[in-house]
């Protein structure tokens, strides 16, 4: 697999001799659309009816196919205040965008994140806000279903 990020909000890769490209398009202030284009006739889209503050990729599951990692701002059933959340989407059957993990929270309220691809296992490094107002940096790894706190 070869993967590169050539422009903001767009990345592409080769896997099994197939070319794939993922992009994020802003349709309005509260509607973003993830597009998956392949060298096949199929085209997959996933609508995000929330503001997006971050868009990245990385093979967090270790299966050889990059996942799409998106930071959205939205409320949840148990936390009605709109806040920053972390969503992870997988590429199913090398053709379709599907949710893998729609995280309502990490350990503390999320401020920002970055995907760390330098390690053998891809990590998600977050900046989180403590109740005291201080910030902490944490690293998470994929553990079957969901993110597991690896280091602070």
Predicted regions and their residues:
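Beta-propeller-forming repeat regions
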Residues: 2-152
